[in-house]
Structures are given as structure tokens and as C-alpha cells.
């Protein structure tokens, strides 16, 4: 595990939960940055390095461990990994629902934040106007999301259902 890539974590927002999930991801990003700063401060003191030298060294180790050929410039500051997994929710004219993963989830621990009793009008693909969804509709979106995540190779799936 690297100090700049500490966990393989992904967060999915259910339909209508984008605002709440955005707040959670913002908090997680702050925790990642705080953790990196604490670890990097301890390592720079212990090894007599500057923070820039440490970031360069850790990036080198990550590049050596990676199977991909590194491209682009060397990072000058720590950037928190993007934890949000984008999903496109679609509702068809016959009432069927579909969840389509936009971002890859292979090997990630995925957290799905979903509110099955949300009674606010929700805009999803396939609908012209925002529509109030029933609990059954929300459950079907949840089931199709879990199914898509498992088929895409996620390491684990955890449901966060704030209502119940």
C-alpha cells in the first residue's frame, strides 16, 4: 500500500443522493489529504528529506510497481484520488430501470449510498421531466446498480441506506 494511493475505494450516489454523496466524498478527500500530510511529515523528519523529495521518491516507487507505463509530468503536490464513480441511471418507457457504470470499478471496494424512500422528484435518463419514484423503483435502481458493480469486478460492495 502506498501513501499516495492508500486504498482502493469508490463511492456511488444513488439517484437523488448526489448532493449528500458529494459532501461525503469531500470529507473523505480531506481525510486522505490529512493522512498523507501526517505520514509525509513523519517520513521527512525520519529520513531527513524535503517533502518534494519524498513525493518524488514515492511516485518513483509507485511507477515501478505499476504495470502501466507512466506518462505526463511528475506531480509537484499530492493530489487525492478521485473516489466518485459515475453511474448513468436510465428508466425506459416500459418501466424497466438500468444502471450503467461510466467509470471502472475492478478491484475497488465500492460503497453505494442510496435512499430508497426518497420522495423528491428525480431526473434520470429516459424521462423528460423529474418524476417521483416509488420505493419499488428505488429498490430496482439499487438492485441493478449492485448487479452492474458485481459484474464489473468490484472487490466488495457495501450499501449505505441512510433511511433505514
Named regions from a protein language model:
Residues 1-164:
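PRPP-associated nucleotide enzymes
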